[in-house]
């Protein structure tokens, strides 16, 4: 009997939070690499457009409504994905939003909402797909973490607490799934240009970036793009059996030191999005 069952030629993947940002980029990247993909999110109109784009490029894609704060929605999404694509080989758990704010100015309800989306929602997805993966003796469950789970930043306490809980959950999964053929991994993005959290005005974002700089957490003005994380997640999923990418952190590279001075510090345009 082989030590490891090899990856099959067909590896259906489900991507939670696929309507925009890292999730959408990951769906596109995995489909480009030959993974059949099932996309889940609340904004089904955006999912439909993404499915059309993937199919137009020769990929295989389906989409279903998904709200990770609703247990029945998660179960329905996973069941419909399996019906459409077959047994799931890869889960990418990336659904989420972010509400920046100082802890003492953040309501307990908002704090709890962040836990529901980023921690409880991820748990719902994992427990929905893992029985089938364990029975199949293979699979990858890949969670989108955050560098704020590793090094806290001001104004991101609720989000960071939820992601720190996710780190602990994934560590437990990795230990408890050892020997089953299922690999649990977490990919931590650094600052990334996506819709999440950046719909704020300059008046809202300004104090946050200023506090980041005070604590030495905004040394330069380059942000990752969603595609950078998509490639990292695809790398984890495609890692050959017999090895396991447990944790990956991706940070934006600093501009060259001889770049103009205005490219060395975070700049804040009127709409609030860092340049």
Report the location of each language-model feature.
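Conserved glycine-rich cofactor-binding loop
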Residues: 19-20
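Conserved glycine-rich Rossmann-like NAD(P)H-binding loop of the short-chain dehydrogenase/reductase
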Residues: 33-50
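Substrate-binding pocket helix/loop in short-chain dehydrogenase/reductase
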Residues: 102-103, 107-115
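Active-site loop-to-helix junction immediately N-terminal to the catalytic Tyr of the SDR YXXXK motif
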Residues: 106, 152-160, 172
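Active-site helix of classical SDR
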Residues: 126, 162
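Residue(s) in the substrate-gating loop at a strand-loop-helix junction
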Residues: 146
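C-terminal helical subdomain
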Residues: 186, 205-259, 263
């Amino acid at each position: 009997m082989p030590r490891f069952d090899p990856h099959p030629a067909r590896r259906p993947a489900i991507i939670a939070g696929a309507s925009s940002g890292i999730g959408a980029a990951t769906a596109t990247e995995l489909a480009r690499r030959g993974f059949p993909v099932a996309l889940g999110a609340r904004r089904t109109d955006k999912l439909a457009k993404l499915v059309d784009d993937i199919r137009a490029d020769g990929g295989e894609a389906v989409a279903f409504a998904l709200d990770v704060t609703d247990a029945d929605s998660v179960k329905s999404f996973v069941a419909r994905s399996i019906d459409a694509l077959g047994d799931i080989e890869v889960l990418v758990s990336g659904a989420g939003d972010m509400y920046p704010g100082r802890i003492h100015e953040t309501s307990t309800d908002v704090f709890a909402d962040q836990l529901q989306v980023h921690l409880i929602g991820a748990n719902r997805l994992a427990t929905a797909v893992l029985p089938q993966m364990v029975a199949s003796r293979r699979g990858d469950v890949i969670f989108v973490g955050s560098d704020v789970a590793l090094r806290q930043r001001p104004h991101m306490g609720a989000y960071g607490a939820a992601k720190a809980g996710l780190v602990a959950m994934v560590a437990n999964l990795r230990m408890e799934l050892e020997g089953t053929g299922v690999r649990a991994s977490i990919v931590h993005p650094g600052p990334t240009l996506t819709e999440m959290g950046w719909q704020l005005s300059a008046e809202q974002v300004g104090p946050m970036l200023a506090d980041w700089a005070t604590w030495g957490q905004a040394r330069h003005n380059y942000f990752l793009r969603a595609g950078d994380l998509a490639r990292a997640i695809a790398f984890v999923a495609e890692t050959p059996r017999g090895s396991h990418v447990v944790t990956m952190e991706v940070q934006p590279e600093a501009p060259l030191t001889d770049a103009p001075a205005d490219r060395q510090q975070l700049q804040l345009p009127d709409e609030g999005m860092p340049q």
